[in-house]
Amino acid sequence: LKKLTRFYHPKTIEEACQFLGNGEGRTAVIAGGTSAALRADSSLEALVDISHISELNYINKDAAFYRIGACTRVQDIYKSPDLKGPAGKLLQAAAGKIGSTLLRNAITAGGNLAGLFPWSDLPVAYMALDAEVVCRRGRPKRTVPVMSLIETRAPQFLAANEIIAEIIVPAYGPGTGTAFAKLAKTANDYAIISLAVRLTLKEGVVNQARIAVNAITAQPVRCLEAEKLLEGKALSEELIAEAANKATDSINIRKDIRASEEYRRE
């Protein structure tokens, strides 16, 4: 960060967006700082630290949704007594698999999405839950599907003076089940593969299936062929095995120093 000359500490969303949009060279947002540290972008001239904006740090629930502020720490998600039911279970399972306690106290709900890496764990949970993201430019805001932000990636999706403010997750109820799994060499290591699943059943038949994976690809993707196979059918061990085999059919699996393409596919 040799060109870094300015560091801003806004107290409100409006201030943060103003700093981002003032046109004073290359500027980036940080909250936990872990993504910025890994990328070490040498062209950055200014950082806007939004971690002290209280209106971005919360976990709330209304009748049908959980609302999570973008600066909520992953550790707070993992330990929150307010996250319950199928959605809460999946979010906490994913949060609990992120690194160590030290890292979970730095990484944020929005940062894990904005600073997207192949090993990021929360985004697959957001995708499986059909979450939405609230993006703010001061007072103006827009609500978009998390899939849209992930597919385009935050730096290209967000305007120069725009930040992720909130993640909205449907609470789901009876008839919905969720699961999260992560394979890594150690408990604190990056994922070789991470997987989030949500199945919503109606009268014993899969009404909606969501299967999202990461680490085997450059960014999280849904296993659309496996989802289609499950929907409209009654669950059985044979169907689940067939869906598992089909999950990676249409996915270009990557290789790296942690695992080969063949190992990840298996």
Where does each model-flagged region fall?
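C-terminal structural segment of proteins
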Residues: 1-266
